[in-house]
Amino acid sequence: GCVPPVLAAAGHGLHVFCEKPIALSFEDCREMVDACRDNHVVFMAGHVMNFFRGVRKAKELIGQGVIGDILYCHGARNAWEGTGASETWKKTRSKSGGHLYHHIHELDCVQFLMGGCPETVTMAGGNAAHRDDRFGDEDDMLFITMEYPDRRYAVLEYGSAFRWQEHYLLIQGTRGAIKIDMCSCGMTLKTGEKEEHFLVHRTKEEDDDRTRIYRETERDNGNQFGRPGRKPFLWLQGIMDEEMEFLNNVLHGAPVTDEFLPLLTGEAARNSIATADACTLSLKEDRKVKLSEIMK
């Protein structure tokens, strides 16, 4: 796990960059966050959705009041995985945490938009179509309901047992809505009778590259998992470049807006795992779980 190297780096006064998920339990996350805070070092997690141009534009539009107050977010990351996914460690729950943890990006993004962790969560799901040992032991269908104060909600769907592939984030407001679509890559703003379209990534070439990849892997989305020696996709290289440029600028003294502060302390990453842990407990005990039960 990441805990020993993060604690060692912090203890030596070194800044830390950690891939997501930073850990598979809230307690491990809290230990790492506390160590980095106590040693006054940056602790950044690889939550790359924060560096999508579309996500940045959506946050800008929301901040300007274009879609009003956010009422509801709906994220989906669904596909079909065949044997192309069987070679990767990500299919082993003890190593990756399963879809909810190793695909934590959408949950993290929703929490950034909604202002933090929900009050309560409920998760249903299980292994519907991948019971053969070749496919690992993670659940291939997960359905999450997140309840926030002031009657605001979010729903997340994750899984690898969906023949109709979807990957999007839908943000519903009192005056309009925004959809960030990663399959047919593009972002749409809808207000009244008006629609406006924006890029998700830096260029149309990167958006088209992502659309092409989803279409080519629709029959077996497991092919998308990275492997040593495989060149990153064009769109993925783009957001990695944006992320590393941001981190480099911060380490060289660039000012940081309030929006990104939780990304540099590990708190946003920790809070995402808190919600994931609450969801896991909900599924295990078949009940609604308060986040306060996890974040004691």
PLM features: what roles do these ranges have?
Residues 31-48, 68-73:
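Rossmann-fold dehydrogenase core element
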Residues 41, 68-72, 280-296:
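C-terminal capping/lid region of NAD(P)-dependent oxidoreductase domains
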Residues 101, 107-194, 238-255, 277-279, ...:
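Contiguous beta-strand/loop segments that form the cofactor/metal-binding neighborhood of enzyme cores
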Residues 49-136, 286:
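Predominantly a Rossmann-like dinucleotide-binding segment in NAD(P)-dependent oxidoreductases
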Residues 48, 175-267, 296:
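C-terminal glycine/acidic-rich active-site capping loop/insertion
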Residues 17, 42-44, 74, 122, ...:
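Structural detector of well-ordered beta-strand residues that form the stable sheet scaffold
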Residues 1-35:
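Beta-loop-alpha module in the N-terminal Rossmann-like domain of NAD(P)-dependent dehydrogenases
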Residues 12-14, 39-41, 152:
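A short helix->loop->beta-strand "cap" motif at the edges of active sites that frequently abuts
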